[in-house]
């Protein structure tokens, strides 16, 4: 979705330059029996990349919901299905108070298909549980006490595991280290570095003090400045991909 590129550009500027706080994102949800669990992943994004929603679906976009929708999922008969999907209407009541209203867009997204099956999805549904240990005002980077993971292959439920926060971080790190060896990662890293460079150029146009400081460093030693910037871009891009990438976790277990 085009809006995701905007979100990435904004987040990259924030992540690398650390001038202002980024925005935590409203999650999708997984309904398991009587529990409604937050999801630290968005299973429908790959579907909407190939089957985009109509341009007029969203009239307003919040910085806390760049994708524009909130989806609710269930595992029914061992299949991952969409229970409902909503957009948020923002309005003021008669007293001038800001209000929000969930409006279903299920029929817009999936027409008359009931219990839309996510047979395109391969990955792990990441559900934080328990107390919030560390709040991070960026994407799904906050750390929780525990995590429930549900492995899905071709839309089918495979297995689940329940981990402490340290066990989850260790698992995520192992997956990321393996992901770094892939051609996909190298491509995404290069794309992220390019977007970071593009974003910083735009950022410099709007902030004269930053532009002056960078120009001063360029004049002092252009070669050293460019080398340092390349290292900075790469580190920022790698950090961004580690914190924001969850779709590289395809299985709960990982082999060495």
Where are these regions (language model features)?
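Bacterial Sec-dependent N-terminal signal peptides
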Residues: 1-26
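Start-of-domain marker
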Residues: 21-82
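Mixed-charge (acidic/basic) macromolecular-recognition segments
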Residues: 144-229
């Amino acid at each position: 979705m085009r809006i995701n590129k905007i979100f990435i550009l904004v987040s990259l500027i924030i992540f690398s330059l650390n001038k202002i706080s980024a925005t935590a994102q409203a999650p999708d949800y997984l309904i398991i029996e009587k529990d409604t669990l937050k999801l630290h992943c968005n299973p429908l994004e790959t579907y909407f990349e190939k089957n985009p929603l109509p341009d007029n679906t969203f009239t307003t976009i919040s910085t806390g919901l760049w994708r524009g929708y909130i989806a609710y999922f269930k595992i029914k008969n061992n299949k991952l299905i969409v229970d409902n999907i909503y957009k948020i209407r923002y309005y003021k009541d008669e007293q001038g108070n800001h209000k929000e209203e969930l409006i279903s867009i299920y029929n817009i997204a999936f027409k008359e298909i009931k219990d839309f099956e996510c047979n395109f999805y391969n990955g792990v549904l990441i559900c934080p549980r328990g107390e919030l240990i560390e709040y991070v005002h960026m994407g799904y980077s906050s750390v929780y006490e525990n995590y429930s993971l549900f492995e899905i292959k071709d839309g089918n439920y495979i297995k689940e595991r329940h981990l402490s926060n340290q066990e989850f971080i260790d698992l995520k790190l192992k997956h990321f280290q393996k992901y770094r060896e892939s051609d996909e990662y190298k491509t995404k890293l290069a794309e992220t570095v390019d977007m970071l460079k593009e974003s910083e150029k735009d950022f410099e146009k709007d902030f004269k003090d930053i532009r002056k400081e960078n120009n001063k460093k360029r004049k002092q030693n252009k070669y050293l400045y460019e080398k340092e910037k390349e290292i900075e871009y790469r580190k920022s891009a790698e950090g961004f991909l580690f914190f924001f990438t969850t779709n590289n976790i395809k299985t709960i277990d990982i082999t060495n």
